[in-house]
Amino acid sequence: MDLLTKLLVFLIHIDQETILNFFGISDPNTIVINSDYQTIFENSELIPISTNVSLETLRIIVQAIIDYSKTGLSLVDIENICLLITFIRFIILAVKYNIKTSFYICSISLFAAALWYFHAKEVLLNWSGSIKGLGMKELSRARSSVIDDKNAYRLSYRSLIVTEFRKQLPGKFSFTDSEIRSSNDFFSLKFALTKAAVRDEYRIDPISMVFSRLPKSLTPVTDKIYYTIFDNLLPRIVNQCIRTFKAMWPVTSWVYITRVWKQYCPYLIRWHWTFLQTYDWIEQYLFKLAFRIAIYAWSLQREGIYDRPAVIAVGLRCMLYMEFLFVFYALIHALFSQYFYVPFLTENTELHVGPRLKIAFIVVAIPIGKSIIHVGSLTD
């Protein structure tokens, strides 16, 4: 059976066109005739093309990668590269140790790399306007993918909300601007409490039913209280709580996972997460400095001075390039279960999570029940 499986591989005809189609690269041998007569392509019956695999195939692949990378990588490309590296590393570690240990090591590394990946998305989103204004074509593809993801999420969420509302309210096909603007926060809760319970123009949710059972003499007062609470007071309270939760969530999750529950969190994740929190605190001041410099350059242009703004633009490009290079440098280190040294930041990180062992092979302890599993390979 194993011999038959190996022989099936040789039954697949692999040529240059097969490899190029697998990587999604256009075939340079495609024959195109003038459109005034006929255009022939992707038709092996009319124009059979089959080129043997050679060094020319490798040259075409390398050239396609170079041409594609001129506008940078998209987020999907970065994700695919990280997953490919993790998969290859999983196979190597599974052969060297075992599948269970390899799975633990790769999962921990991938989680640590995901922290830097989401930070890179946040930086791209915050500085998308500057990337476009400074003409940083190497980051244009990643910037476009971040904006497309954000717009797609907004459109899909709003369309889902409106679709569900129209199912519940068949007589209403339009919603006010305030309802649409608040759809991300309070609109769903408000609809669940009130509008979703409308039947025959009457609200049958428990809160409305309680107010409807009050004496008619109190209706002018109770109705005013009811609409004041549901239309003014409660939306403001909920929106403020949501904004506070969103602002506190990064720090709160870091504190509980890396400090309170640190016995359940591998050292690699705690190290990179703590380093990222410290770096993010410093990074915001660098970005504020860049924003002030950009305003200064814009003011100089209004005065008719153009040589200094050009130099400032070059400096801003260098700063943003260095920012993204460092983020992806840290991402690669996390993906391979490695650490790196940055003055002040590394010392501050290890004051929080403890110093790492200076040995060629270090393990990460994962307590499971009464036993402790040691996984992870790290070098000094």
UniProtKB/Swiss-Prot annotation:
Assigned keywords, A-Z: Chloroplast, Plastid
Subcellular location: Plastid, Chloroplast
GO-annotated cellular components: chloroplast
Entry annotated with the keyword Chloroplast: yes
Chief location bin: plastid
Pfam families from the UniProt entry: YCF90 (PF17088)
Family: Belongs to the ycf90 family.
Protein name: Uncharacterized protein ycf90
Organism per entry: Trieres chinensis
Higher taxonomy: Eukaryota, Sar, Stramenopiles, Ochrophyta, Bacillariophyta
